[in-house]
């Protein structure tokens, strides 16, 4: 399968080729429901994670969700949270029939691209010990040195880390104000507020 990563275009209803994986930022309630459905299948169904541990209060607290689709079907999801000097990779989830490389790799690549564009130089994750070698093979994500394994939700975890290189046009405090206002991941194209800037200021109450 070949991965098609698309953070700048909304999902198109036209069916994609079977082998294509398309990753987009979740922008609608329907997108988020798809991510929640996938996570429910994998974490609650397969790993028997309790509901209140899987849905931990962080899904609406400044998080960005990515959705992977093959054609019109959601097949994977991932959550990103943003801290002062690092991004946090969470809830990487792939449907059982789509595991094997292309879908998780597409989600990871999209997460790295998005975090780097936001100016982050490090992305950290909490990875189940059994999955750490797979993450290293797929995306060169390494285990943090000097950090002890830890346990939550019945699994043993390690901290993993990947260094990122922000692009020259990464978002900074000095970026154009209208660029900063654009939808997440769509900073290179005019948004609705760009269009509104063509109207003269009337300063209505």
Residue ranges and their predicted role:
Residues 94, 100-113, 125:
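Conserved acetyl-CoA-binding loop-helix of GNAT-fold acetyltransferases
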Residues 39, 134-140:
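Conserved active-site tyrosine of GNAT-family acetyltransferases
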Residues 62-66, 87-90, 156-160:
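Short beta-strand micro-motifs in enzyme catalytic cores
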Residues 67, 73-81, 86-93:
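Conserved beta-strand in the GNAT
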Residues 2-54, 60, 67-70, 166, ...:
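Short amphipathic alpha-helix that is part of the acyltransferase structural core
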Residues 55-61, 150-153:
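A short beta-turn/loop motif at secondary-structure boundaries
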Residues 126, 141-163:
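Conserved catalytic-core motifs of GNAT/GCN5-like acyltransferases
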Residues 115-128:
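Conserved GNAT acetyl-CoA-binding A-motif
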